[in-house]
Design a protein with these regions (language model features):
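N-terminal lobe/hinge region of extracytoplasmic solute-binding protein
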Residues: 38-127, 134, 157, 161, ...
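Aromatic- and charge-enriched surface segment that lines or borders ligand/interaction sites
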Residues: 52, 62, 67, 87-95, ...
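A structural "hinge/loop" feature
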Residues: 58, 78-94, 118, 145, ...
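Detector for C-terminal structural segments
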Residues: 76-78, 91-94, 241-246, 250, ...
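Gly/Pro-rich hinge or "lid" segments in bacterial periplasmic/extracellular proteins
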Residues: 79, 99-112, 157, 204-265, ...
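Surface-exposed binding/hinge segments that line
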Residues: 134, 169-216, 232-241, 386-400
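Ligand-site clamp/hinge motif
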Residues: 136, 223, 254-307, 348, ...
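Extracellular/periplasmic solute-recognition and catalytic clefts
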Residues: 176-177, 238-249, 274-338, 345-349, ...
């Protein structure tokens, strides 16, 4: 089942650094001859040591004796038109991650550590310039054929050519790849312009989705498809009703069922996803017994939407489960490619006009926390004044950053958050002053530029439940003479417009793990700003942001990493690229009483893969 945490592993590649021989050779062809000088081990930790020993039997947050059987159903919103999750085209169905596998898999109880899956051994060069994986001799595709190094090399080449932009970018860092035998594959990595090596690259290769080379013979990898694609994972697709429903069945002879990284997981015989256009309808379907579990992101629904016989008699159980992961940084994101949002003063002004305290109380029942970081709910968030490792990361750019960044903590506007209407009025006066500095004036109740063009823009949404906040935001801009309108489209249109960067403002988020890395360049880097399908929705083009984001991937200690992430966070906050909204410090989950979970909850929060069905 798909986790609600969006953990994208992405980096900005430097194609100019790729040598002429960087293309993946045919299986068995010679390459540079990749030197290795580190010991063979059972996994990789981004920083420090692995928490689990080589002989561990299961992750600590699962129940190895969990009951097998039953069905887990989810009522979800949206639609889908593809069963191929690893290309740009199409909207893939939920749950496909359980069909495909990777060489290594994450422990969700560590910031960023990987253990064996398709590969049972890994050897990393001391400077992380190369990595070797040994493929598990038992690894099998769903047709019973073995997973081989040829499949891995094929997958790399397909991702380089046709993968999502983030994957194309970081797989371009592979300078050489070779398969000395059917169970071994080696990768060497290009260095950065300053000679450093992206220390995350061995882990990113471990997380590359592996496809069957034989399956794709005669098929176009770069086309959306509703034909089930053969995988090696614990589930296969059973039935598909395009856009409406998809059902997965557990692979009875799944090759990896007894692996330490799989034991106690994927317990249901069937996973069913029923799609609804509206989340309120999906909630009613869940309450009516057409779903077994629901992650609730809407505090209003959590506060008032679950009452009914099933909850009162105990058939529905609601839980608030704490987690220690960064929550998604959700906000109203400015598309700074649009001329009206190119000026920082304009972006700052628009963030000062809304009474978010009222929104938090009235719309969210006081259950959410206002977001004031790109890494909220974690020790990665900038706080106070920069010091230590963070200050060291910022110092080289002091002359290119606002002086206030070093002497004043970043704070959200106070108006409406305890200072009452007077504070909000003061903020709006300051907002008008900033807009006037940027060349805008209120004339006859309309904010216009010198040529008489009105300040007008559209907020693009895909979920009707988001309209409440967006409409309140637009109303708060009316006293400034701004014409802001909300447009809600279906999920396919929404994703298409985001991919093509055809929007003024949108309500979206950036999600990070406890070990941010190369994906930060894809979220905020200059090169990603102009790429179709980019996650740099804001269109950020700032050399300081580029340098800080790039430095994160080469941090050698946890302390260095935290300091550099905090530095990036602080620079992004002072750039006012979004109007921050809210986040929840807990996971709110409603489930059927017949759906059970392990006693231990991992660092990143509850993992539905480890739950089971029992009377």
């Amino acid at each position: 089942m798909a986790r609600p945490i969006l953990l994208l592993l992405i980096l900005l590649a430097l194609p100019a650094l790729r040598p002429a021989c960087a293309e993946v050779p045919e299986h068995g062809a010679p390459t540079h001859g990749i030197a290795m000088n580190a010991g063979v081990t059972h996994g990789i930790a981004m920083h420090g040591d692995l928490a689990l020993p080589p002989d561990f039997t299961a992750f600590p947050y699962v129940d190895p004796a969990a009951r097998k059987g039953g069905t887990i159903r989810q009522a979800v919103t949206g639609s889908f038109d593809s069963l191929h999750p690893h290309i740009v085209k199409g909207v893939p169905a939920l749950g496909l991650g359980h069909v495909f596998e990777t060489l290594l898999t994450r422990s969700w109880d560590e910031p960023f550590s990987l253990y064996g899956l398709l590969a049972d051994r890994v050897e990393v060069a001391g400077d992380r310039s190369a990595v070797t994986f040994r493929i598990n001799a038992n690894a099998r595709w769903h047709d019973g054929t073995p997973v081989t190094a040829a499949d891995v090399l094929f997958s790399l080449e397909m991702q380089r050519r046709h993968g999502t932009p983030n994957r194309r970018l970081f797989y371009a860092k592979v300078a050489a790849a070779e398969a000395p035998d059917p169970q071994t594959v080696r990768f060497a990595f290009a260095s950065n312009a300053d000679g450093t090596i992206d220390r995350e690259m061995p882990l990113l290769m471990g997380l590359m989705p592996i496809h069957s080379k034989a399956f794709w013979e005669g098929r176009d990898f770069n086309r959306t498809t509703l034909e089930p694609i053969m995988g090696s994972g614990p589930y296969r697709i059973a039935t598909v009703d395009p856009g409406r429903r998809i059902v997965y069945e557990r692979v009875r002879d799944y090759w990896g069922r007894d692996l330490p990284t799989r034991l106690g997981q994927f317990n249901a015989d069937r996973l069913e996803f029923d799609y609804y256009r509206d989340d309120s309808v999906a909630l009613e379907a869940f309450k009516a017994g057409q779903g077994d579990v629901r992650y609730e992101s809407d505090p209003a629904k959590w506060a008032t939407g679950y009452d009914g016989p099933a909850r009162r008699d105990g058939r529905i159980v609601r839980e608030e489960l704490p987690n220690r992961r960064p929550e998604p940084a959700r906000g109203l994101i400015f598309n700074t490619r649009r001329p009206i949002f190119a000026d920082l003063r304009v972006r700052r002004a628009l963030g000062m006009a809304t009474d978010f305290d009222w929104i938090g109380r009235s719309l969210f029942h006081g259950l959410l926390t206002r977001t004031a970081s790109y890494y909220p709910n974690s020790d990665l968030a900038a706080r106070g004044l920069p010091e230590g490792e963070e200050l060291r990361a910022l110092e080289p750019f002091r002359d290119r950053l606002p002086p206030e960044l070093f002497i004043r903590p970043f704070t959200l506007p106070d108006g409406g958050t305890g200072s009452g209407p007077a504070g909000l009025r003061a903020n709006r006066r300051e907002a008008l002053r900033l807009l006037e500095q940027a060349g805008w004036r209120v004339r006859d109740g309309r904010l216009t530029d010198a040529a008489g063009n009105r300040f007008a823009f559209e907020i693009l949404l895909s979920d009707p439940s988001e309209e409440r906040v967006a409409l309140e935001f637009t109303r708060s801009l009316e006293p400034l003479g701004i014409d802001a309108r909300v447009r809600t489209v279906d999920s396919a249109q929404f994703q298409g417009r985001l991919d093509r960067l055809e929007f003024d403002m949108t309500m979206r988020w950036w999600a990070s793990s406890l070990s941010p890395g190369n994906e930060q360049l894809y979220y905020y880097g200059s090169e990603a700003a102009g790429q179709e399908g980019s996650r740099n929705l804001a269109g950020i083009r700032d050399p300081v942001v580029d340098a800080l984001a790039r430095s994160i991937a080469v941090a050698t200690t946890r302390a260095e990493l935290i300091g550099r992430v905090r530095a990036l966070d602080r620079v992004l906050l002072w750039g006012h690229y979004m109007v921050p909204l809210f986040h929840s410090p807990v996971d709110r989950i409603a489930r059927r009483s017949t759906l059970h979970r392990p006693v231990n909850t991992p660092l990143y929060g509850p993992m539905l893969e480890s739950w089971w069905v029992a009377p």
